[in-house]
Curated annotation (Swiss-Prot):
The species this protein was found in: Mus musculus (Mouse)
Domain TSP type-1: 516-571
One Pfam family per UniProt: ADAMTS_CR_3
EC numbers on record: 3.4.24.82
Name recorded for this polypeptide: A disintegrin and metalloproteinase with thrombospondin motifs 4
Taxonomic classification: Eukaryota, Metazoa, Chordata, Craniata, Vertebrata
InterPro entries assigned to the protein according to its UniProt record, in alphabetical order: ADAM_Cys-rich (IPR006586), ADAMTS/ADAMTS-like (IPR013273), ADAMTS_ADAMTS-like (IPR050439), ADAMTS_CR_2 (IPR041645), ADAMTS_CR_3 (IPR045371), ADAMTS_spacer1 (IPR010294), MetalloPept_cat_dom_sf (IPR024079), Peptidase_M12B (IPR001590)
Residues covered by region (Spacer): 682-833
Gene: Adamts4
Length: 833
C-alpha cells in the first residue's frame, strides 16, 4: 500500500461540473413538469413566435472624422439608420475600455469558411440623435454592426443578415433590426399556477502569509465545433467569456489578488493534428493536456509562455455514468506544465462560471460539498458558489465560498503558485463592457439552447433566470438552466440586469468604477498551539478598509503574523515528543489500515523525507517498516526534524532558535546547551578493529552524551560487519538477535531521543544523532564474515564533571564556634604572654 492509499496526490482526481436538465417552475417530478408546461404552452402559445417587431434595414455610413493613430479606426463614426418609420443618427466612437491590444488569433488547420480569418472588429459606444439618455453599444468589424440600441424607452437589436446584399452606397449591407416588446406589455402569457401552499420555485443547482499579485497567463483554445457554431463572432465571444471569468477571480471573496490574463488564443480547424475531442471528458482532458504542452515555451519570461490552458468545445462531454458534464480539470496543478489545463463544454455565456470553476480546481479548490468544505462553509453553504458541484446561480455578493478562499490561500502560501508571480510585459485587456450589452437575451438563449431558441419574456421576474423557447414532442415550451441574464442585459425602459437583479441604468455606473481595497486592523492573538515546549499563535487582518469592489485591486502585503508562545520545557513525565504524540494518535486507527494484521505502533519517520515534506506527518509502522503521510501537516510548533530547532508553521518549516523562539539566533553547542560555548562537555572518540564472529561490545556511550557519530571506514570487508545498539536493560534497539534493518531508519530510544541509521545495506554504515541520551547505550558490532582492514570509528561528547566547591558550614556550627571562643577568652591563661 502506497502513500496514495490515504492521501491521493494532487492532480490524480478529475472533477467535473454538472448541469441541470431543462427545469420548469413546478414542484412535482421534472418529466411531468415538462409535459404539463409543454401542453399549457401549446394551448396558450400554439407554435407562434414571441411578440417582437422586425425589419430589414441598410445602415448608411456617413463620413467619419480623423483616424485614430496606429489603429485604422476612425475617431468618430456616423451611421444613419432607418428604424420603424424614423431615421436614427448614430454617433459612435471607439470604447477604450474594451480593446484587446496585441492579441492575435492563431489558426491551426483549415479554418471554417465562416471565420474568414481573424476578427478585426472593435467596440463602439455612443448616442442616438444626440439624445444624452440614449445608448448605442455596437461591435464594428469595418462593415457590419452588431449590438444594442436604447432610445426613448425602446430596445433595438441590430445584427447582420446572413447573405444580405450590400446597399447602393456600398455600406455594410442588409441588417435585421428587432424592436422588442416592453416587459410590461400584454400578450400571450406562460403562467402555471402551483398548488395551494406550495413553495415558490427556486433555483438549484512567495512570501509566507503574504498577499501577492498573481498573474495567470492563459492559453485559450477553441475546437472546430466552436468555430462552426460561433462563426465570425468566436473571438469576441471567447474574450467575453474569459472577461467574466477574470471578473470572478477579481472578487474579494477569493481573498487573494488573482489576475486572469489571456495571452494566446488558438482556434482549431478541421484536419488539424490537435487534441482528440470526444464524448469522454477524461480522455479529452488527457489528450488536451498532452497536446497543449507542445505549444508552450519553458521560459517563463517568453511572451508565448502560458501558465495554464483551457479548451472550449461544443462537444457534449460525458463523465463516468452521465453526460451532464460541463468541464473537467486536474486539481492543484497550476504550475505543472503537463497538467495545468482544463476543458469546458460551451453552454452559453454562463460558461464563464464553468471556466472559473475548472480553473478553481487547478488552484487546488475542492467542491463545496466535499467533507473539508462542509466544515469550513457550514450548513447550506455549498450551492451558490463557483465551486458548487452542480451549476446553479452564483451569489454575486460572495461567488467564492470560505472553503475555496482557504484552499487557494493555503495552496499559494505553500509555494505552489511560484510561476504566477511574473507580470506580463504587455498585459492584454479583456472586454470591460457588460456582456449583456453585446449579447441580448435572445442571443443568450441561442448560445445556450441553439440557434432556433429565443427569450421567453413573460416569465417574471426579469434577470433572475434566463427562460428560453424550445420544443418538446412538437409542442412549444420554455426552459431554463437557472443561470441569470448576463450583466448589462436590458430588462426594461432604461433598465439593465446586474447580478440577477433589474436595475436602473444610472445604478450600473456604481458597478463600473473600481475601488481598491485597504487593510483593516490586526486582530487579537489566537490560542497557542501547544501548552509547553514551544507553540505558535496567530493574528490576522482582512482587506476590509475598504473592501475592493468592481474589480478593484485586492490588498497586498502580509495578512497573517505569528509568534512563539509557551516556550518553557514540558514536564519530565512527557515520554513522547510532540511529533511522536501525533503519530501515536493513529495506533488504533484500524479503519484506515484494513490490510494490516492489527493495530500498529506508529513512530515518526525522518529518514528519506525530502526537506519540503518535513512538515507533513510522515509516520512509520514500527513492526512492518512501511511509512505513510498520515496528515498533510503536523501541528504548528512541531520541530521540523530532530536535527534542527526550526518549527513547522502552517505546513512550512520556519527558523527558530534553540530557545524555541521564532526568529531567534540562539543555537545549541556541541554539549546541547542553548547559547553555550562548548565548555561544558568534552569529546570522546576512538576506533575499533578487533573483529570476531558474532556480537562484540565496542563502547558504552554514557547517559547525557551528545552529538553521537559512528562510522565504518576502509577495508574490503565492510559488507560483513554491521552496527548494533543495546539498551541498559539488555534489549536491542537496533540489529539485535541477528535481525538486520536493511533500509535507512530512525532508531527511537528512551527519553524521546532518536538516532539516524543509514541501513545495513549502505556501502558504509553510519549512526548519528544530537542526543542527549537519557540512559547508557552500548554500541556493538555484528561480524558475519571476514572483515579485512575494516575499522569502526566513533565520537561523542560527554558532560564535564562539575568542580566541587567547599560547602559553607551550617549556621548552628558557626554560632557554637563563637560561643566556644568566647569561653576560651575568659580563661586565666587567656591574657598571659
Amino acid at each position: 500500500m502506497s502513500q496514495m492509499g490515504l492521501h491521493p496526490r494532487r492532480g490524480l482526481t478529475g472533477h467535473w461540473l454538472q448541469r441541470f436538465q431543462p427545469c420548469l417552475p413546478l414542484h412535482t417530478v421534472q418529466w411531468r413538469r415538462l409535459l404539463l408546461l409543454a401542453f399549457l404552452l401549446s394551448l396558450a402559445w400554439p407554435a407562434s413566435p414571441l411578440p417582437r417587431e422586425e425589419e430589414i434595414v441598410f445602415p448608411e455610413k456617413l463620413n467619419g472624422s480623423s483616424i485614430l493613430p496606429g489603429s485604422g479606426v476612425p475617431a468618430r463614426l456616423l451611421y444613419r439608420l432607418p428604424a420603424f418609420g424614423e431615421m436614427l443618427l448614430l454617433e459612435l466612437e471607439q470604447d477604450p475600455g474594451v480593446q484587446v491590444e496585441g492579441l492575435t488569433v492563431q489558426y491551426l488547420g483549415q479554418a471554417p469558411e465562416m471565420l474568414g480569418g481573424a476578427e478585426p472588429g472593435t467596440y463602439l459606444t455612443g448616442t442616438i440623435n444626440g439624445d444624452p439618455e440614449s445608448v448605442a453599444s455596437l461591435h464594428w468589424d469595418g462593415g457590419a454592426l452588431l449590438g444594442v440600441l436604447q432610445y426613448r424607452g425602446a430596445e433595438l437589436h441590430l445584427q447582420p443578415l446572413e447573405g444580405g446584399a450590400l446597399n447602393s452606397a456600398g455600406g455594410p449591407g442588409a441588417h435585421i433590426l428587432r424592436r422588442k416588446s416592453p416587459a410590461s406589455s400584454q400578450g400571450p402569457m406562460c403562467t402555471v399556477k402551483a398548488p395551494s401552499g406550495s413553495p415558490s420555485p427556486i433555483s438549484r443547482r512567495t512570501k509566507r502569509f503574504a498577499s501577492l499579485s498573481r498573474f495567470v497567463e492563459t492559453l485559450v483554445v477553441a475546437d472546430d465545433k466552436m468555430a462552426a457554431f460561433h462563426g465570425t463572432g468566436l473571438k469576441r465571444y471567447l474574450l467575453t467569456v474569459m472577461a467574466a471569468a477574470a471578473k470572478a477571480f477579481k472578487h474579494p471573496s477569493i481573498r487573494n489578488p488573482v489576475n486572469l490574463v489571456v495571452t494566446r488564443l488558438v482556434i482549431l480547424g478541421s484536419g488539424q493534428e490537435g487534441p482528440q475531442v470526444g464524448p469522454s471528458a477524461a480522455q479529452t482532458l488527457r489528450s488536451f493536456c498532452t497536446w497543449q504542452r507542445g505549444l508552450n515555451t519553458p521560459n517563463d519570461s517568453d511572451p508565448d509562455h502560458f501558465d495554464t490552458a483551457i479548451l472550449f468545445t461544443r462537444q457534449d462531454l460525458c463523465g463516468v455514468s452521465t453526460c451532464d458534464t460541463l468541464g473537467m480539470a486536474d486539481v492543484g496543478t497550476v504550475c505543472d506544465p503537463a497538467r495545468s489545463c482544463a476543458i469546458v463544454e460551451d453552454d452559453g455565456l454562463q460558461s464563464a462560471f464553468t471556466a472559473a470553476h475548472e480553473l478553481g480546481h487547478v488552484f487546488n479548490m475542492l467542491h463545496d460539498n466535499s467533507k473539508p468544505c462542509t466544515n469550513l462553509n457550514g450548513q447550506g453553504g455549498s450551492s451558490r458558489h463557483v465551486m458548487a458541484p452542480v451549476m446553479a446561480h452564483v451569489d454575486p455578493e460572495e461567488p467564492w465560498s470560505p472553503c475555496s478562499a482557504r484552499f487557494i490561500t493555503d495552496f499559494l502560501d505553500n509555494g505552489y503558485g511560484h510561476c504566477l508571480l511574473d507580470k506580463p510585459e504587455a498585459p492584454l485587456h479583456l472586454p470591460a463592457t457588460f456582456p449583456g450589452k453585446d449579447y441580448d437575451a435572445d442571443r443568450q438563449c441561442q448560445l445556450t439552447f441553439g440557434p432556433d431558441s429565443s427569450h421567453c419574456p413573460q416569465l417574471p421576474p426579469p434577470c433572475a433566470a434566463l427562460w428560453c423557447s424550445g420544443h418538446l414532442n412538437g409542442h412549444a415550451m420554455c426552459q431554463t438552466k437557472h443561470s441569470p441574464w448576463a450583466d448589462g442585459t436590458p430588462c426594461g425602459s432604461s433598465q439593465a440586469c446586474m447580478g440577477g437583479r433589474c436595475l436602473h441604468v444610472d445604478q450600473l455606473k456604481d458597478f463600473n468604477v473600481p475601488q481598491a481595497g485597504g487593510w483593516g486592523p490586526w486582530g487579537p492573538w489566537g490560542d497557542c498551539s501547544r501548552t509547553c515546549g514551544g507553540g505558535v499563535q496567530f493574528s490576522s487582518r482582512d482587506c476590509t478598509r475598504p473592501v475592493p469592489r468592481n474589480g478593484g485591486k485586492y490588498c497586498e502585503g502580509r495578512r497573517t503574523r505569528f509568534r512563539s508562545c509557551n516556550t518553557e520545557n514540558c514536564p519530565h513525565g512527557s515520554a513522547l515528543t510532540f511529533r511522536e504524540e501525533q503519530c501515536a494518535a493513529y495506533n488504533h486507527r484500524t479503519d484506515l489500515f484494513k490490510s494490516f494484521p492489527g493495530p500498529m505502533d506508529w513512530v515518526p519517520r525522518y529518514t528519506g523525507v525530502a526537506p519540503r515534506d518535513q512538515c507533513k506527518l510522515t509516520c512509520q509502522a514500527r513492526a512492518l517498516g512501511y511509512y505513510y503521510v498520515l496528515e498533510p501537516r503536523v501541528a504548528d510548533g512541531t520541530p521540523c526534524s530532530p536535527d534542527t530547532s526550526s518549527v513547522c508553521v502552517q505546513g512550512r518549516c520556519i527558523h527558530a532558535g534553540c530557545d524555541r523562539i521564532i526568529g531567534s539566533k540562539k543555537k545549541f553547542d556541541k554539549c546541547m546547551v542553548c547559547g553555550g560555548d562548548g565548555s561544558r562537555c568534552s569529546k570522546q572518540s576512538g576506533s575499533f578493529k578487533k573483529f570476531r564472529y558474532g556480537y562484540s561490545d565496542v563502547v558504552t556511550i554514557p547517559a547525557g552524551a551528545t552529538h553521537i557519530l559512528v562510522r565504518q571506514q576502509g577495508g574490503s570487508g565492510l559488507k560483513s560487519i554491521y552496527l548494533a545498539l543495546k539498551l541498559s536493560d539488555g534489549s536491542y534497539a537496533l540489529n539485535g538477535e541477528y535481525t538486520l534493518m536493511p533500509s535507512p531508519t530512525d532508531v527511537v530510544l528512551p527519553g524521546a531521543v532518536s538516532l539516524r541509521y543509514s541501513g545495513a545495506t549502505a556501502a558504509s554504515e553510519t549512526l548519528s544523532g544530537h542526543g542527549p541520551l537519557a540512559q547508557p547505550l552500548t554500541l556493538q558490532v555484528l561480524v558475519a564474515g571476514n572483515p579485512q582492514n575494516a575499522r569502526l570509528r566513533y565520537s561523542f561528547f560527554v558532560p564535564r564533571p562539575v568542580p566541587s566547591t567547599p560547602r559553607p558550614p551550617p549556621q548552628d556550627w558557626l554560632q557554637r564556634r563563637a560561643e566556644i571562643l568566647k569561653i576560651l577568652r575568659k580563661r586565666p591563661w587567656a591574657g598571659r604572654k
